[in-house]
Amino acid sequence: MSSDWDEIKRLAADFQKAQLTSTLQKLSERNCIEIVTLLLEKQLLDVVFTNDGKEYITPEHLEREIQDELYANGGRANLVEVSKTLNVDLSRIEALAERIAADNPQIHLMLGQLIDEDYITHIAQEINEKLSQRGEISISDLTSQFDLPSEFLQHNVMEKHLGKTIKGRQDATNPRVFFTQAYIQRCKAKIRGALAAITKPTNVSVILQQINVQEKIFHSLLDEIMPAGQVTSKQANAQYVPHIYAKTQAEWVNSFYKQNSFLEYEAINKLGISDAKAYIRKQFPNEQFLFLKRVALGAHLIELTVVSALNECSATKQYLDLATILPSNLSEEDIEEAFDAVMAQKHCNPSQFVYLQSIVFSQAYLTQLIQPCHDMAHALAKAAIDSGAYQQYIVEKTLAQKGSNSSANFDADDDGKVDKRDERRKKAASGKAGGGAQGRETKTKSTKKHQRGRAAAHNHDSDDDEETTQQSAGSSRKSVKPLELVKSSDVINRIKSTLEEEGLEHLAKPIAGLFVNQLNQAALAKAQELYEATPQTNRRQTHAAIQERVNTLLVDLRLYEKGIKLFNTDTQAQLIKYLLKSLGNDICNELTLYVAAECSLSVKMTNLNVDQRIKLIQECDAQYRNALLEQNKALNKSIEDFELATEAVLKTCSMIIKKADKKKDRALIVSHKEKLMQQLSECREPALLLHLAALILFTTITGCILHASGKFVSTILQHIRPTLNESQNALLLRYHDLVLQMLQQGTTDSPESKSLNEQLQTLQAEVVDLAQNFSRVSVSKAD
């Protein structure tokens, strides 16, 4: 090591000698570089190279230059700028800056900047000057101004120089806010002056805008000022209410309530009080009020005036005009609301009164008023029986109920889609039956031809799971309107004269509306009583009609079964299930309702499901019960089982079972097809049109009729496909695909839906023509 040092000394001496000698004896730049490199390799020299590598400097000298830059920049130097100025790598500058900050407590390294105490003192002086001008300052403002961390400004500047360089104090509620005492005094003076000048409720925001004081300072100084008023809250919409105004408000409210025993919310709101109900409760803590929508009624007004008057009205069996005992400025709605509230509070028995247009009638008064109308209702019931109007109503109602029962039911898989299918549901047509005598030994003949033909095409839903085939056996049915024996005009004419004497004739119509249904029901009950007292021949006619109707449905069932047997086993099972749930359900309803009537059971519903029928059957006589229960169970079995169960029920009801007649069956099939064609010619809905066309073609090709819902259309088309030629099959397949696409669209307003509808309209005439004009002869020619 000593030899190396001796060599270095020798080289240094040679270097000095070379500098003192002439140019020819100086070291070259290369030699100088080699010497410095050798010193660095032997770690005998520590230097810092510039970024361009042309110069180098010792760390001590670089440290002095950094401090010089800090001084030259006023005590705050950005290390990035220092690196650019000194042309030294930033990492070297940062390392030396950390050492400078660690060695010198007067210098701070903060966010890549060197800051000395002189600069901190300087910004403290600036902050003090700004604070003296504004009176209040926050750390957030200083952070944005000086671009320094808030914590550094908080602890190293503000709190360190507070009370020394910075003349002010720190907010106790918010340590990041500083202000001067003079500023606080000015704010107090502004607030005190503004509040002293206010004589009516004023929004706090308006006050702050006028005096230019922050809201938080306003609320913090408000208690110290002790103003002659109060602030409603510390929310954005708070108001300052001076005591003098509150006193005036209270005096007005007390005076009005003392004179009238009620208070209007609108009048209180006009005084500047937003929550009238809360103010009333606060102003009258010991008073009981009935709070309505527009007014608050005092308890003594209710107890001493309204309740006592109502009790007197009930006791005297008269009526009461509430408008005459309540304040005149209450509207009719207010009076009605007050009456409802009194009834709700159980001050009086609600069932004893009827309210009509501010007039309260006691039930006893109305009962006496309507009493003559009961005699009129009985007279009208007798007149309906004598004229046959009630008997006609009973027949029409029975046929309508049967028609509803024989309408095709929805398939079990489509229960969730009832709404869409109901929109397209049509009423089925009913068959007309002839009369006959009751008894097993007497055969009954039909007096008219069976007019049947099932509207066997029906509702298609959006998933192409369409339901359902409508069945008809005669002219189309319409829903029967309830029989109106007692009309509103009859009641009005009967009570109007009595009301005119009291000056209440304008209430004749509302009163009649209250009792017309009751009187009509009484008249219908009387008519039913008279009807049941008529000769037994009426019962025999009903027996014959039910017998004819059930036999007609059984014939339909057998004819539909023939068509079902043409399909494969799986499809047969589905079609049989659907047939029994629709047509079989109608037969069960017919017989169950007939037996219920024979057993004197009252049945309000006519379209019963299995559970409802079973519940009703349990109440019937024992002689019918087992047969009816077996019939209901047979709905889930085969058609043969159901027919046997139905025949057993017919025998228990003393009804005759007709034998099959092939000639009549052929006529019925032709009639059914004609009905379908008539519906097809009138149909405009593509899905229903395709359904009808498929059923007509099936009947034409097979000679059998079919009871199938819309979801079986594709199965029917597949079954008749071999009988049709290629063009006919292509037409039906194309129309079927377009129908499916239209149902899947879901909306009729889109361009795609309009385009599909146009295509369907184009093909509609061809489909109708194919269904109406197709025959077996044409099939043979095509083949």
From Swiss-Prot:
Recorded GO CC terms: endoplasmic reticulum membrane
One GO-annotated biological process of the protein: regulation of proteasomal ubiquitin-dependent protein catabolic process
Disulphide-bridged cysteine pairs: none
EC class (word): transferase
Record keywords: Transferase, Ubl conjugation pathway
Listed EC numbers: 2.3.2.-
Composition-biased stretches (Basic residues): 445-457
Region (Disordered): 404-482
One MF annotation (Gene Ontology) recorded for this entry: UFM1 ligase activity
Family affiliation: Belongs to the UFL1 family.
Known role: E3 UFM1-protein ligase that mediates ufmylation of target proteins.
Protein's name in the database: E3 UFM1-protein ligase 1 homolog
UniProt lineage: Eukaryota, Metazoa, Ecdysozoa, Arthropoda, Hexapoda
